């Protein structure tokens, strides 16, 4: 397991984002991150109900990373890259109430379900 500081570039959907990852020694890379262990509804679909839930998940992720976050960064824990070339990771942030894992919070709030690969 590797741990990095990262800053948000852009939120793609409820379980995917682009970020600038600090590798140390003033070396940074811009990568797409897929939140590991969870799956959110798709926000780019013709199914209007799924799209509505997908946009709600994206909004929840936005609030956590941009609104609740007291630092300008989050902590990325990652051990691998997925089959589509995205970094698979768990995100942690610090808020006024304490620290928490974004992946777990999305599941707890009903915006995501646990997912560990395979058929959805």
Predicted regions and their residues:
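Small beta-barrel nucleic-acid-binding modules, primarily SNase/OB-fold domains
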Residues: 1-120
């Amino acid at each position: 397991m590797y741990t990095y500081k990262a800053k948000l570039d852009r939120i793609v959907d409820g379980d995917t984002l682009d970020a600038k990852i600090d590798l140390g020694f003033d070396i940074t890379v811009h990568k797409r991150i897929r939140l590991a262990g969870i799956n959110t509804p798709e926000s780019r679909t013709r199914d209007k109900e799924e799209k509505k839930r997908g946009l709600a998940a994206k909004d929840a992720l936005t609030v956590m990373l941009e609104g609740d976050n007291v630092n300008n960064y989050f902590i990325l824990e990652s051990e691998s890259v997925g089959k589509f070339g995205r970094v698979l990771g768990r995100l942690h942030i610090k808020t006024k109430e304490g620290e928490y894992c974004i992946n777990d919070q999305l599941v707890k709030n009903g915006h995501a379900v646990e997912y560990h690969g395979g058929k959805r």
